[in-house]
């Protein structure tokens, strides 16, 4: 028994009295409280320093709110090429923001299959599970396009005192993340900061719709078209302008293409009002240039150019067909204004209607000129009793000059024509080098140009000009006067008034 008792030595725990336990417990509590307080104090100081640094950086990063400073989103590496304020605002975040985002998900029950710690930098733009990114990751997307089910939270904007709940995480301090820092409005309106796509649905309820005035500014910033998902009805902010394909130009509405009728209305006043004295085309539509060329008639020139019509208006500009004898244009322009000045000296009131135009296509080149009329008369042997060739080259003689003048008046529809007026017109051919007066002989003239050229110009396309017959106004014998007695007297004009009552196709008064 002694050995047995010697073998068993009981292990005795030295007992402590109740007073010793009371003395030792406050020491342990003080140590534990000191450690907790020290940890919280250190964490608060650390986060406070980061918050102050963040405030200093945000204060330095303020830029003037104008349209000149817009970040360029077309670069492939946005972080390397973006302006420094944008880079600082997008990347530098304290761990407390990550922890607070974690606490948001844990507290509000978000289960999106994403990692708890979400990095807010521009590198990590993860789409929500179940959605494919619409554009390559080099193009920053609008939050409304990245995740239309979850509108962007109130990130960079104060939300009337509602701070994110910290959840079970203790000792976070004043939550120095930039989401809760109240910054001036113009700065937040300058940048489009990518938001995390896995924000809970409950957050946008306390966010007014007018907190997104900066979305309009970046409507024309992205470099690739983004086709949004169908907007969810009832979600705040779904009526904001969507992001479109744009470069960095300011927002201006694209000018609509000019309507097709704009050019036609532009051309109409030119032809209706631009040329006085010419009849304009009908006002119902635009006329083609060929229609404009065919509008001017002979009476435009007959109104002031009585004897020989100028080919300046008709020769090269208003002709609609050019077949045959292509070099006729220049000589016709050479003879254009030969008969203008003498007839302007007439002071009488012209009451005769214009000449009725009919005949072969020769008339398409304009009215008959005096030298053509003389060549046509000389070419017809039936007219040899009042005009004939003398046989000396290109000389011809006006045997009855008043008869020639009368026929010329019939041709030009001028009954008052006489030889004096005809001779004044012939004097201009002297200056033009077409004909000359033969010295020493009365009523004898000669053409000085080449005979072949003369006849080819007088008879284009080998067609004789159409000469009008005797006057359609049938006068009685007592009304007819000798040619030498024709005057520009009012009595003669009153006698000829009966001729003006005859119907003409173009009865334009002078």
UniProtKB/Swiss-Prot annotation:
* Molecular function via GO: DNA binding; DNA-binding transcription activator activity, RNA polymerase II-specific; DNA-binding transcription factor activity; DNA-binding transcription factor activity, RNA polymerase II-specific; RNA polymerase II transcription regulatory region sequence-specific DNA binding; sequence-specific double-stranded DNA binding; transcription cis-regulatory region binding
Q: Show the segment(s) annotated as Disordered.
A: 131-208
Q: Which residues are in coiled coils? A: none
Compositionally biased region (Low complexity)? 161-174
What GO CC annotations are associated with the protein? chromatin; nucleoplasm; nucleus; plasma membrane; synapse
Would I find Phosphoprotein among this entry's keywords?
A: yes
Provide the alphabetized UniProt keywords.
Answer: DNA-binding, Isopeptide bond, Nucleus, Phosphoprotein, Ubl conjugation
According to the UniProt record, which residues make up the DNA-binding region?
368-448
Tissues/organs with expression:
Ubiquitous.
Q: Its GO biological process terms?
A: cell differentiation; cellular response to oxidative stress; locomotory behavior; male germ-line stem cell asymmetric division; negative regulation of transcription by RNA polymerase II; neuromuscular synaptic transmission; positive regulation of glial cell proliferation; positive regulation of neuron differentiation
Chief location bin: nucleus
- PTM annotation (Phosphoserine): residues: 248
For this protein, the record's PROSITE patterns field holds: ETS_DOMAIN_1, ETS_DOMAIN_2, ETS_DOMAIN_3
Alphabetized Gene3D superfamilies for the sequence: Winged helix-like DNA-binding domain superfamily/Winged helix DNA-binding domain (1.10.10.10)
InterPro entries attached to this UniProt entry: Ets_dom (IPR000418), ETS_fam (IPR046328), ETS_PEA3_N (IPR006715), WH-like_DNA-bd_sf (IPR036388), WH_DNA-bd_sf (IPR036390)
- One Pfam family this sequence matches: ETS_PEA3_N
Which subcellular locations apply to this protein? Nucleus
Q: Where is this cross-link: Glycyl lysine isopeptide (Lys-Gly) (interchain with G-Cter in SUMO2)?
A: 350
Identify the SUPFAM superfamilies for this entry: Winged helix' DNA-binding domain
Query: Where are stretches of biased composition, namely Pro residues?
Result: 175-185
Similarity remark? Belongs to the ETS family.
Listed under subunit, the entry gives: Interacts (via C-terminal) with ZMYM5 (via N-terminal 120 amino acid region).
Task: Please give the function described in this protein's UniProt entry.
Answer: Binds to DNA sequences containing the consensus nucleotide core sequence 5'-GGAA.-3'.
What is the protein's given name? ETS translocation variant 5
Organism for this UniProt entry: Homo sapiens
């Amino acid at each position: 028994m002694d050995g047995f008792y010697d073998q068993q030595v009981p292990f005795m725990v030295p007992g402590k009295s109740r007073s010793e336990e009371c003395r030792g417990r406050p020491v342990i509590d003080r140590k534990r409280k000191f450690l907790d307080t020290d940890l919280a104090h250190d964490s608060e100081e650390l986060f406070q320093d980061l918050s102050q640094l963040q405030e200093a950086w945000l204060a330095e990063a303020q830029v003037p709110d104008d349209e000149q400073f817009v970040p360029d989103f077309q670069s492939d590496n946005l972080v390397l090429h973006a302006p420094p304020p944008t880079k600082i605002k997008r990347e530098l975040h304290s761990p407390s923001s990550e922890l607070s985002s974690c606490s948001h998900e844990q507290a509000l029950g978000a289960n999106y299959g994403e990692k708890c710690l979400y990095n807010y930098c521009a590198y990590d733009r993860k789409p929500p599970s179940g959605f494919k990114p619409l554009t390559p990751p080099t193009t920053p997307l609008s939050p409304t396009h990245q995740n239309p089910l979850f509108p962007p939270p109130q990130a960079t904007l104060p939300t009337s005192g509602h701070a994110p709940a910290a959840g079970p995480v203790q000792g976070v301090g004043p939550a120095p993340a930039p989401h809760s820092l109240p910054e001036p409005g113009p700065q937040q309106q300058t940048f489009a900061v990518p938001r995390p796509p896995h924000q809970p649905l409950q957050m946008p309820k306390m966010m007014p719709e007018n907190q997104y005035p900066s979305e309009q500014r970046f409507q024309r910033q992205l470099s690739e078209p983004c086709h949004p998902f169908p907007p969810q009805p009832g979600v705040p902010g779904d009526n904001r302008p969507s992001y479109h394909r744009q470069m960095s130009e300011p927002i201006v509405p694209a000018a609509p293409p000019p309507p097709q009728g704009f050019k036609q209305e532009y051309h109409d006043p030119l032809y209706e009002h631009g040329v006085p004295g010419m009849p304009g085309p009908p006002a119902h539509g635009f006329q083609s240039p060929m229609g404009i060329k065919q509008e001017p008639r002979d009476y435009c020139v007959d109104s002031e150019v009585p004897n020989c019509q100028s080919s300046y208006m008709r020769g090269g500009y208003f002709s609609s067909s050019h077949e045959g004898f292509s070099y006729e244009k220049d000589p016709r322009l050479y003879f254009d204004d030969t008969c203008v000045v003498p007839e302007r000296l007439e002071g009488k009131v012209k009451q005769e209607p214009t000449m009725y135009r009919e005949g072969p296509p020769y008339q398409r080149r304009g009215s008959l000129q005096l030298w053509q009329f003389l060549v046509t008369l000389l070419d017809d042997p039936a007219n040899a009793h009042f005009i004939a060739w003398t046989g000396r080259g290109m000389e011809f003689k006006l045997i009855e000059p008043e008869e020639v003048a009368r026929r010329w008046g019939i041709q030009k529809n001028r009954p008052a024509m006489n030889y004096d007026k005809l001779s004044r017109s012939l004097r201009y051919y002297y200056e033009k080098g077409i004909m000359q007066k033969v010295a020493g002989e009365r009523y004898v003239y000669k053409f000085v140009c080449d005979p072949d050229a003369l006849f080819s110009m007088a008879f284009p396309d080998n067609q004789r000009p159409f000469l009008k017959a005797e006057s359609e106004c049938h006068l009685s014998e007592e009304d007819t006067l000798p040619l030498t007695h024709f005057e520009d007297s009012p009595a003669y004009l009153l006698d000829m008034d009966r001729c003006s009552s005859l119907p003409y196709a173009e009865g334009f008064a002078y």
